[in-house]
Amino acid sequence: MDKKLINRIFAILAFVVSFITYALTVQPSVPFWDCGEFSGATVWQQVPHPPGAPLFLMVAKLFHLFLPFGDPGWKINMTSVFADAFIILLVYLITYRIIENLMGKKVETTYEAISVYGSSLVAALAFNFSDTFWFNGVESEVYASSNLFVALIIYLMMRWNEEADNPGHEKYLLLIAYLIGLSTGVHLLSILTIFSLVYLVYFRKYQIKPVSF
């Protein structure tokens, strides 16, 4: 069986299982706490508590406008459902790359493909069913969308690490910088990835010396 096909099947499976899980358990209307504020701010495109979340409100507004059925609160909650489903897909992609790095080689045989990709799927689904992650994936809060930016940045960091010796590798760093800036329109959490990015670039491209550090 083709290794790329196995990889794609498992990746799609991770996304589908996550999406179905959260779609079946999403809050049917407006949840408690800040969710009500974000739901109201989304519908009327107003400003929630500082520092605000303009990008989240605009994306959630699209769900409110274009989902043809359901309670307005439910529509906005679906923003987090889609965000968390894509996070689980990225967790799968990140995990199998970590395993390949530990192996010191790419997957070569069908047996290795099933072992590596299957293990990555288990890891992704374990994260999918964890309590805190699940809790944030079924309500109109910014955390799911913020975590999506973090997961995407980590994935791009791994892609850059793979391509760091090839021409054009800077495009990954530029995209990461853009996403970090964009993510501040959702939550400030993604700024923490800057420290990991700096360490990655340093250890990948420079000799480890007290002066250079």
Task: Identify the role of each PLM range.
Residues 110-114, 150-173, 180, 199-210:
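Membrane-interface transmembrane helices that cradle and orient dolichyl/undecaprenyl
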Residues 8-9, 91-129, 164-171:
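Transmembrane-helix signature of polytopic, membrane-embedded enzymes
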Residues 12, 78-108, 152-156:
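Transmembrane-helix motifs of polytopic, lipid-linked glycan transferases
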Residues 69-77, 102-113, 120-147, 180-190:
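Aromatic- and kink-enriched transmembrane "portal" helix at the membrane-lumen/periplasm boundary
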Residues 188-201:
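Transmembrane-embedded, aromatic-rich helix segments that form part
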Residues 42-74, 78-82, 89:
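Short hydrophobic/aromatic helix or loop-helix immediately within or flanking a transmembrane segment
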Residues 41-44, 124, 172-185:
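Membrane-interface alpha helices of multi-pass inner-membrane proteins
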Residues 1-21, 86, 108-121, 211-213:
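Start-transfer (signal-anchor) and selected internal transmembrane alpha helices
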